[in-house]
Amino acid sequence: MHILVTGFAPFDNQDINPSWEAVTQLENIIGTHTIDKLKLPTSFKKVDTIINKTLASNHYDVVLAIGQAGGRNAITPERVAINIDDARIPDNDDFQPIDQAIHLDGAPAYFSNLPVKAMTQSIINQGLPGALSNSAGTFVCNHVLYHLGYLQDKHYPHLRFGFIHVPYIPEQVVGKPDTPSMPLEKIVAGLTAAIEAISNDEDLHLALGTTQ
């Protein structure tokens, strides 16, 4: 399969974003998949246009977006995105939407059509912290996952799409002893394992849910 993997530019006054750092270190061939890479701005208003133009000019079987989730201690494939922008902080264009629908003609939520449980289990099988997430937040990460679902629904019915959040890397938590992080090479290994699992036509039937 031809897979586009995206990462984000740094945001919130940070100098690094582990999502893009990890994406740049992925091999160009993973299993039977050919990997293209794209850096996205952390911008509500710009990401849709960039994704739209990229999909209009290239054929991809899968788009997998990667984002930073500071405070998480595991690599977390996302199950679902919701139709809301509700930004706790401004994006890199100083835009801070609050309680705004992403697409007025879109569904309340879009579920990733990738085998998210198989991807999560593949990460865990590498001896790495992995967990299935049921919330991509309400910042630009959720926005991108929702927009991909919207595009699949309205324009690209055969497109497979998903999102994975990754933790901070150690240099981001200097002076923050209680904040979890993960070495970049482990994030790269986890993403590689997840991408390999995309080959699964059907997801695994595993109890990876949560009680809260």
Swiss-Prot record:
Pfam families associated with the record: Peptidase_C15
Function: Removes 5-oxoproline from various penultimate amino acid residues except L-proline.
Record: active site: 78, 141, 165
NCBIfam families linked to this entry: PRK13197.1, pyro_pdase
Cross-referenced SUPFAM superfamilies: Pyrrolidone carboxyl peptidase (pyroglutamate aminopeptidase)
Protein name, UniProt field: Pyrrolidone-carboxylate peptidase
The protein's assembly and partners: Homotetramer.
InterPro entries: Peptidase_C15, Peptidase_C15-like, Peptidase_C15-like_sf, PGP-I_bact-type, PGPEP1_Cys_AS, PGPEP1_Glu_AS
Listed EC numbers: 3.4.19.3
Similarity-based family: Belongs to the peptidase C15 family.
Principal EC category: hydrolase
This protein's GO CC annotations: cytosol
UniProt source species: Staphylococcus aureus (strain MRSA252)
Catalytic activity field: Release of an N-terminal pyroglutamyl group from a polypeptide, the second amino acid generally not being Pro
Annotated localization: Cytoplasm
Any one GO BP annotation for this protein: proteolysis
Keywords per UniProt: Cytoplasm, Hydrolase, Protease, Thiol protease
GO molecular function annotations of the record: pyroglutamyl-peptidase activity
Chief subcellular location: cytoplasm
CDD domains assigned to the protein according to its UniProt record, in alphabetical order: Peptidase_C15 (cd00501)
